[in-house]
């Protein structure tokens, strides 16, 4: 950076502003461009892919102000904040600079513009603080007005926080240094999420429009989070302060899905994209609010049986009334994003097209009322909710319909927003502007008739404005009401009061029209803002209507059935399918499977080759639970789902390179978390646990984990354990609640007499006996020379050992588990051992085995 004395006045002004806003990329207004300088320019150039230039040795780049929103959006998506620095006043004298200041700060969590947001994705700002034993949080989507708080005072491991963040996928997180240090090691905040260090706003002063003091009793951390978040928002978007009212959300009312489960089950994304996820498959919603609500339901399945049945019954009613869905879909298609429009209305940022969209949305009130008259029994509680607001909706619809043009320009300053007939003064001004020639001609004819001056005419020049001109010969007929304005050689020019009024109207009509239109538009907007609570409630009800009808439609399209839901520990389904995988395959080619857990079987050990369908089997069990507990029908011929409190997964390999952790270390940490957190109501999915180390280490760990999870007399979590360790099948003989299954494979000879296999994708009861690894390699396209060599090596090994490799390993492991070590394992009180102690025991046993 240049020395201060070498800087131009403009750059000194910029540096002064930037020094006070070091965390922002400053969009510095210069005429028709926003310019960025120095480090901001370098970063913006990289993010935006625009040219980096120099002026006076200072790096700079710029974007047109009228297209700034697109560029700001790209920067926000990178997790950065933008400060809009505008010219707010003119300098004194020609040499003086424009006065400039930051007029708005846009952060990833405070965006409200549609073109910076995804229509069907919530945009959360989350504030999190931890204390000695737990944590509190506030979650706000300023674009919709959603605002809730929660607290878990007894979650020292922060498991609940991890699940909450996984479900929210926040755009921005506020925390203090203490909290950051605690959550950093757990990797629960992705690197792409913007994080801001803020001080805690601890105050006993609760805003008057918030819930009363009693709601916050014992929830000090949650209240602190709420106050801190509001203070942060108020700095960046002052208009929101009085529009955001929190409610308390008990997250223990929802099925817990941690980040691993959300990611590996591909609930809302697959490899970062929405396509290929469960959400994408299920989303036939018509409104943006419906799309966001559907995603929220997928990530937050319910635990309360009555609430689940309430949703399920609404879906079932739509399922039984397909015409109700078809007719509702037509109505909902005209509804815009009411939630986000109303947030912009409340802050005074709603534009003409926002109100035009709102007008179209509210115009459905008549059709919606008729629909409820016809199909109200389908969703009785929503009927009452929506119809109670119909009078207000109708009044607002009438206001918008009479006031706002249906296809207005983007900006208020472009004019043409207010409808003809809404305001008499505006109509008069427009008539004056549009009919000025006609008005002047009519005046001229009236004055000729009144005065009898046949040569009278009306004219205009830039010096004197409008005038009435009379020839010298007829000037004697001019009435006393005329005021002389100019004398010419052959004529006299006059002005009258009426002509003055017409002149004023014509010359100032455009300015007055714009000023009056702006005032009228603002008046309509303020009137709408008075009903923001009703409108948000209406939008929420519309979203639920959309989702209920959508889920019924999915049930028809994908041939889902209504499951039995209860408080039991049963997880049972006949002909269960994975709906996303099924949708990717040719019609009718997906192979369904049965599942039966929680009765006689607590743990299913599933063996078989890669590509045999084990992982899909695990995932479809989880999808079954999620769909059932969100109130949906399920992809099975029949299903019985006892409510599950947590779905915990250890599926797939993932290095934590940034944390210096190997695949195996990540696997062990995730497994340790599962062992420490599961309950008898949990569903655990384990896929190839232990494979990241040596064979004996892996077998030992997998064996010990299975024993740790096993609880006699139905006291343990439901577990599906897919493994290549065939040795684990011995556990079925030792424990009554463990049962073996295998992925079925068909062996056959091809035309050349070569052994081949076909995957049948059927999960059958009983243990598998081969891994078919070489066959899988062949199917995957390994070079023929590699396959031939592998077959020769395994034959040589089997010949050398005098038995098959797999049989020999079975014998070794059999010896291992008949040794004194197994007696020690039997004596371990698994209820009293922590996951870390269990792993230490395993390492000790390993040392003794190797010695």
Swiss-Prot record:
Transmembrane segments: none
Keywords noted in UniProt: ATP-binding, DNA damage, DNA repair, DNA-binding, Nucleotide-binding
Top-level taxon of the source organism: Bacteria
Recorded GO CC terms: cytosol
Example of a GO biological process term: mismatch repair
Pfam families to which the protein is assigned, alphabetical: MutS_I, MutS_II, MutS_III, MutS_IV, MutS_V
List of residues binding ATP: 608-615
Entry's Gene Ontology molecular function annotations: ATP binding; ATP-dependent DNA damage sensor activity; damaged DNA binding; mismatched DNA binding
InterPro entries: DNA_mismatch_repair_MutS (IPR005748), DNA_mismatch_repair_MutS-lik_N (IPR007695), DNA_mismatch_repair_MutS/MSH (IPR017261), DNA_mismatch_repair_MutS_C (IPR000432), DNA_mismatch_repair_MutS_clamp (IPR007861), DNA_mismatch_repair_MutS_core (IPR007696), DNA_mismatch_repair_MutS_N (IPR016151), DNA_mismatch_repair_MutS_sf (IPR036187)
Function: This protein is involved in the repair of mismatches in DNA. It is possible that it carries out the mismatch recognition step. This protein has a weak ATPase activity.
Family designation: Belongs to the DNA mismatch repair MutS family.
Identification of the protein by name: DNA mismatch repair protein MutS
């Amino acid at each position: 950076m240049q020395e201060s004395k070498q800087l131009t006045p403009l750059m000194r002004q910029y540096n002064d502003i930037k020094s006070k806003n070091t965390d922002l990329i400053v969009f510095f207004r210069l005429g028709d461009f926003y310019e960025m300088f120095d480090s901001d320019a370098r970063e913006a150039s990289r993010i935006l892919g625009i040219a980096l230039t120099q002026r006076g040795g200072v790096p700079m780049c710029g974007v047109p102000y009228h297209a700034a929103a697109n560029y700001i959006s790209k920067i926000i998506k990178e997790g950065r904040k933008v400060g809009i620095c505008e010219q707010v006043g003119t300098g004194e004298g020609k040499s003086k600079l424009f006065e400039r200041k930051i007029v708005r700060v846009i952060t990833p969590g405070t965006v409200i513009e549609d073109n910076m947001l995804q229509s069907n994705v919530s945009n959360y700002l989350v504030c999190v603080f931890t204390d000695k034993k737990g944590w509190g949080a506030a979650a706000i989507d300023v674009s919709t007005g959603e605002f809730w708080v929660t607290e878990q005072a007894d979650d020292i491991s922060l498991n609940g926080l991890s699940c909450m963040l996984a479900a929210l996928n926040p755009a921005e997180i506020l925390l203090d240094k203490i909290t950051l240090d605690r959550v950093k090691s757990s990797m629960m905040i992705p690197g792409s999420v913007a994080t801001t260090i803020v001080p805690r706003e601890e105050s006993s002063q609760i805003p008057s429009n918030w819930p009363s003091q009693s709601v916050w009793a014992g929830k000090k951390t949650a209240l602190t989070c709420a106050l801190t978040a509001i203070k942060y928002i108020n700095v960046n978007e002052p208009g929101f302060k009085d529009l955001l009212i929190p409610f308390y959300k008990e997250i223990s009312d929802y099925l817990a899905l941690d980040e691993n489960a959300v990611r590996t089950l591909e609930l809302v994304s697959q490899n970062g994209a929405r396509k290929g996820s469960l959400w994408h498959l299920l989303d036939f919603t018509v409104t943006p609010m419906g799309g966001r609500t559907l995603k929220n339901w997928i990530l937050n399945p319910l635990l309360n049986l009555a609430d689940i049945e309430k949703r399920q019954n609404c879906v079932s009613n739509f399922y039984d009334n397909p015409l109700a869905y078809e007719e509702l879909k037509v109505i909902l298609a005209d509804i815009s994003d009411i939630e986000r429009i109303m947030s912009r209305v409340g802050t005074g940022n709603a534009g003409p097209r926002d109100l035009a969209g709102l007008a179209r949305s509210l115009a459905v009130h008549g059709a919606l009322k008729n629909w409820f008259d016809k199909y109200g029994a389908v969703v009785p509680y929503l009927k009452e909710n929506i119809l109670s607001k119909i009078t207000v909706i109708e009044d607002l619809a009438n206001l918008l319909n009479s006031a706002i043009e249906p296809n207005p320009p983007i900006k208020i300053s472009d004019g043409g927003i207010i409808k003809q007939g809404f305001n008499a003064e505006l109509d008069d001004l427009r008539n004056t502007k549009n009919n000025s020639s006609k008005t002047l001609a009519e005046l001229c004819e009236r004055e000729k008739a009144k005065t009898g001056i046949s040569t009278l005419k009306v004219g205009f020049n830039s010096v004197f404005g409008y005038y009435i001109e009379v020839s010298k010969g007829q000037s004697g007929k001019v009435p006393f009401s005329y005021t002389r304005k100019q004398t010419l050689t052959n004529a006299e020019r006059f002005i009258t009061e009426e002509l003055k009024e017409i002149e004023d109207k014509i010359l100032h009509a455009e300015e007055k029209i714009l000023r009056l239109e702006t005032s009228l538009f603002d008046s309509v907007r303020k009137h709408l803002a008075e009903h923001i609570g009703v409108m948000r409630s209406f939008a929420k009800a519309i979203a639920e209507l959309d989702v209920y009808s959508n889920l019924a439609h999915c049930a028809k399209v994908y041939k889902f059935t209504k499951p039995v839901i209860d408080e039991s520990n049963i997880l049972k389904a006949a002909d269960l399918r994975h709906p996303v995988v099924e949708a990717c395959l040719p019609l009718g080619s997906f192979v369904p499977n049965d599942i039966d857990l929680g009765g006689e079987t607590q743990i299913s050990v599933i063996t078989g080759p890669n590509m045999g369908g084990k992982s899909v089997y695990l995932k479809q069990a989880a999808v079954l639970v999620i769909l059932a507990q969100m109130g949906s029908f399920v992809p099975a011929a029949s299903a019985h789902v006892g409510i599950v409190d947590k779905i915990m997964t250890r599926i797939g390999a993932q290095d934590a390179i940034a944390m210096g952790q190997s695949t195996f270390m990540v696997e062990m940490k995730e497994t340790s978390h599962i062992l420490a957190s599961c309950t008898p109501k949990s569903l655990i999915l384990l896929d190839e646990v232990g494979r990241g180390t040596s064979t004996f280490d892996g077998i030992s760990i997998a064996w010990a984990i299975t024993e740790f999870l096993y609880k006699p007399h139905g006291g343990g979590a439901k577990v599906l354990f897919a493994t290549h360790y065939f040795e684990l099948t011995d556990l079925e003989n030792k424990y009554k609640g463990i049962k073996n299954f295998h992925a079925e494979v068909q062996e056959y000879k091809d035309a050349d007499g070569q052994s081949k296999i076909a995957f049948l994708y059927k999960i059958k009861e009983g243990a598998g006996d081969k891994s078919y690894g070489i066959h899988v390699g062949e199917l995957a396209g390994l070079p023929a020379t590699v396959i031939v060599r592998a077959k020769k090596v395994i034959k040589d090994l089997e010949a050398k050992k005098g038995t098959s490799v797999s049989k020999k390993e079975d014998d070794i492991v059999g010896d291992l588990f008949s040794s004194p070590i197994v007696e020690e394992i039997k004596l371990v009180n698994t209820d009293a051992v922590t996951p870390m102690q269990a792993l230490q025991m395993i390492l000790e046993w390993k040392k003794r085995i190797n010695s």
